[in-house]
């Protein structure tokens, strides 16, 4: 009996741990201007909130080859990136208070890391979402699909 209870408790802990791990996404960037991985997927059911950890493994400083991670709908992504250019580095190349931005990190340079945690309640399973870098000129090639499942 005692062994069965311990087994059930152990399985519960492992299951909770597995769900927690899938709610933390590791994303890498470098001076070559691409995200690794290029597609991200989360489950709203398993992840009421998601943390994205962004790590820049390049060598250039953020004023020269900075990167951030920004999430918006695909329909809004180009307009957000364009508007961000005028906002400047002090504003992370994002218009302050822009409601089209679902989540974003700070701009980081080589050897730095940052993270953002956001709720998934407002996301739609099967919706069309894009993550991208809003640093000037990076949007054209530095973007990926953010897939939301139920």
List each language-model region with its residue ranges:
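N-terminal edge beta-strand
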Residues: 21-49
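Beta-strand signatures of extracellular beta-sandwich domains
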Residues: 68-72
């Amino acid at each position: 009996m005692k062994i069965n209870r311990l087994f059930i408790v152990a399985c519960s802990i492992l299951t909770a741990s597995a769900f927690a791990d899938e709610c933390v996404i590791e994303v890498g960037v470098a001076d070559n201007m691409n995200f690794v991985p290029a597609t991200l997927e989360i489950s709203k059911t398993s992840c009421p909130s998601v943390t994205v950890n962004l790590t820049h493994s390049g060598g250039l400083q953020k004023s020269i080859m900075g990167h951030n991670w920004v999430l918006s709908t695909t329909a809004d992504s180009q307009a957000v990136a364009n508007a961000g250019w005028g906002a400047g580095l002090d504003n992370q190349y994002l218009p302050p208070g822009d409601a089209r931005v679902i989540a974003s990190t700070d701009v980081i340079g080589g050897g730095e890391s940052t993270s953002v945690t956001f709720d998934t309640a407002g996301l739609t399973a099967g919706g069309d979402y894009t993550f991208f870098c809003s640093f000037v000129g990076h949007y054209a090639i530095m973007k990926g699909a953010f897939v939301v499942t139920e």
